[in-house]
Regions:
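Generic low-polarity alpha-helical segments
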Residues: 1-2, 77, 169, 178
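Active-site rim elements
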Residues: 33-34, 101-117, 155-159, 176-178
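Mobile gating loops/cap/lid regions near enzyme active sites that modulate substrate access
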Residues: 121-124, 128-178
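Alpha/beta-hydrolase fold catalytic core
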Residues: 19, 81-133, 137-144
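Alpha-helix boundary/capping residues
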Residues: 8, 79, 92-94, 176
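Substrate-access "cap/lid" subdomains that shape
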Residues: 1-67, 71, 109-132
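N-terminal leader/propeptide and maturation segments of large enzyme subunits in energy/redox metabolism
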Residues: 63-85, 89-92
């Protein structure tokens, strides 16, 4: 558990509390999965998809009540470390969004940050590397999903127009089973 807790201090790419972190072990994973080294030649096609609100379940599950805007930076500090958080916090991609009543709920920003950080950026980087090295990648983002069992435990995930993590599974699996 000590390694898990200190991962953010050991590797610049590691975030705080990431449960799964694939590593180049020379046996199962023989080359980096990011852009830090030349990618091996490939020829298999891949389907890589994400959903619009990947981090919605995690963020709204951890914080069921609205968060004040003042909570955004400390949560980013805890996730990315104090040296990297300012880049995220100052990005126009994660600017505060006013709700209809004029208030700001930091969960909105955190959901976008989480979706980008853990799903979208890593998927797109991997797809780009795959294609640049001979493979084909079909990349998509689901804007409509099929609510995955269990996602109803977080009210955000049951909202109109919301597609949370795993809401693509039954669609993708059914396509391949037919």
């Amino acid at each position: 558990m000590n390694l898990f807790s200190n991962a953010i201090n050991l590797a610049p790419a590691a975030g705080n509390a990431q449960p799964i972190r694939p590593v180049k072990d020379g046996y199962f994973i023989t080359s980096p999965l990011d852009s830090t080294a030349p990618f091996p030649a490939v020829n298999k096609p891949l389907l890589i998809s994400t959903v619009a609100h990947e981090a919605g379940f995690a963020v709204h599950g951890a914080f069921p009540d609205p968060l004040p805007e003042a909570a955004f930076q400390p949560i980013c500090n805890a996730t990315f470390g104090s040296s990297r958080a300012p880049v995220v916090v100052s990005s126009p991609n994660y600017a505060p969004v006013s709700l209809p009543d004029g208030s700001v709920d930091a969960r909105t920003q955190l959901q976008v940050v989480g979706t980008d950080y853990l799903w979208r950026c890593s998927s797109w980087t991997f797809a780009r590397n795959w294609v640049q090295n001979g493979g084909a990648a079909y990349v998509g983002q689901y804007l409509v999903g099929a609510s995955y069992p269990g996602n109803n435990a977080v009210s955000f995930c049951t909202g109109a127009g919301i597609v949370c993590h795993q809401d693509d599974i039954e669609i993708v699996v059914c396509i391949f089973l037919q």
